Structure formats: structure tokens, C-alpha cells
């Protein structure tokens, strides 16, 4: 499918379903380093803010998940249990539980308050690389190096469906805001949209050439999909039309599956880590780089945006091992 930016992309893209569009939009963000979180002993793999805004969870190659205070970066607790490195962690909608994906071929469901592992989800035949809850948080989705996507029931820990999704490792999986659709990305160069109830593939987004898809995510309102590919490119798709609306470049991403994000608490930005040790922030509309955050000493593998405040968390690989919290006053 052609990925030339369609003419109607000049129309403003409303990302969030809330009615806060009338806010004064700042010219540029002005994120500055607030604090550095030290605790992991190997590469950090993922950072995620809890939906209630209170906590930050980080996962690492050290097999641990650490919970931190979202605003002050204060160490809260460590979750132990995986046998091999963890690639991803995700929160339930009520911020009470976490799911983690590990090279030990399992996912674990955690009770955050007690720090206990509630269930271990077994069924993948290779590394589990990515995971997410659906909005009601009764289902978990996972993607693996076994090239499948699995849908799990939280209550029982049973696998409900296995989607023979891709012909290479699955790099990312995400539910839309209603929980009716799933998006998956893979090293096979494809981004696929699935019906969550039936497990049917509804659409495949195909790029001009087929660079590996390293990350995918629905926009907050579910109308768009953000994809990252290992040719130093992020793209915003109107997936119902199969059209690429925006392309974001300037960062470095050819090797790692780096998390990207929509920032909607101030202006409308796209935020991503990069292999040149920086966090990049683009204006969603104009595609201009509006800020680069400097401070990490290795690849920034993950960047997360706080649900209500102008806060970004970033995490870096093994020459750094830290998480940084960045704050903007507008």
C-alpha cells in the first residue's frame, strides 16, 4: 500500500476522545530532567506509568520488575519470579495488577499491592516479547518469538485463542480503547489488525518495502495506529483507509524494538527513544522534531507518557541501566 501522506492529513488529528481540544496548545514542549532512578542491574527493557498516574513500573534483563513513585521516582518494591530476562510489562486498567513477558517463555500476572505472582501463563514455545491488557482487563494479549499472538483469560490464566499471526517474531501487541480490535507488529514487516472476539484478521498494513515492524500502538481514541520500523521511521496510519498520514524521522532506530508514544497532556506530541541515546519529541501535526532529551548513556529503549501530567519516563540499555523522569511545565 502506498505510504505517501494523504492530502487530508493536513486536517487536524484529534487523538483523544475527551473534549479538551480547546486548551492553549504550547509552541514547543520544554521537558527537563527531574530525577534518575537507579535500581536495575542490567538493561532496562520497558517502563509504563499506571493508568491512575501514581506509579511507574520498569522491567529489565535482570529478571525483575521495579515499582517506583511516578512523581518523585521513589523506590516502592520489587517483583521477583521470572527465570530469564523480561522484555515487557503492562498495567491493568485499575492499576492493581501487572502482566510481564519474559524470555522464560511465560507471562506472569502480579498483584501490585502484595507484590505476589498470581498466575503464570504458559503456552508460548519461545521468548514472550510483548504484552498488554484489554481495557476491561479481563483479557491479556501476548506476542512471541514463536510468531504467534495469544489471548489469555485473566481469571483462569488459560489461553483462549492462538493467532498464527506472523511469519517472524511478534514485536508488539495492543488493544484499541474499546477492546474490540488488536494490532500486532512483526519482524516480517507486517502490521495486522484483528477482531478481538473472533480472532479474524481484518486488515494488513503493508509498507512500500518491508522493513521489520518494531512497535505498534493504537492512538488514545482508537482511530490511528502508530508504527515504528527498523529503517529509522515512525508512521501514523489511518488504518480504516489503510493510509499513512504522517511520517516522523530524524532519530536512529535500526536494531532495537523501541517503544513510542502519544503525548496528549500538553501539546500533541509523538515521543520515542532512539539508538543515539536520546529521547525524541515530534510535533504530531507538523512532524518537526521539537525537542531532544539528552542524559542517557546507552540506547533509549522505552519512553512512556504520564496519563495526566506532562511527565515522560525513559529507560536505557546495559551501559546505562537507569530510568529518567522528565517534566515540562506546559
UniProtKB/Swiss-Prot annotation:
InterPro entries on file: G-protein_beta_WD-40_rep, WD40/YVTN_repeat-like_dom_sf, WD40_repeat_CS, WD40_repeat_dom_sf, WD40_rpt
Sorted UniProt keywords: Repeat, Ubl conjugation pathway, WD repeat
Task performed by this protein: May function as a substrate receptor for CUL4-DDB1 ubiquitin E3 ligase complex.
The keyword S-adenosyl-L-methionine belongs to this UniProt entry's keyword annotation: no
Family note: Belongs to the WD repeat WDR5/wds family.
Gene expressing this chain: WDR5B
Compositionally biased spans, kind Low complexity: 11-23
GO molecular function, one term: histone binding
Pfam families in the cross-refs: Beta-prop_WDR5
Source organism of this protein record: Homo sapiens (Human)
WD repeat windows: 39-78, 81-122, 124-164, 165-204, 208-249, 252-292, 295-330
Keyword Repeat: yes
Gene Ontology annotations for the cellular component aspect, listed alphabetically: Set1C/COMPASS complex
Motif DDB1-binding motif positions after renumbering to this chain: 188-192
SMART domains noted in UniProt: WD40
Record-linked PANTHER family: TRANSCRIPTION INITIATION FACTOR TFIID (PTHR19879), TRANSCRIPTION INITIATION FACTOR TFIID SUBUNIT 5 (PTHR19879:SF9)
Name of the featured protein: WD repeat-containing protein 5B
Description of how the protein assembles with itself and partners: Probable part of a cullin-RING E3 protein ligase complex containing CUL4B-DDB1 and a substrate-recruiting component (DCAF). Interacts with CUL4B and DDB1.
Region named Disordered: 1-26
Biased composition (Basic and acidic residues): 1-10
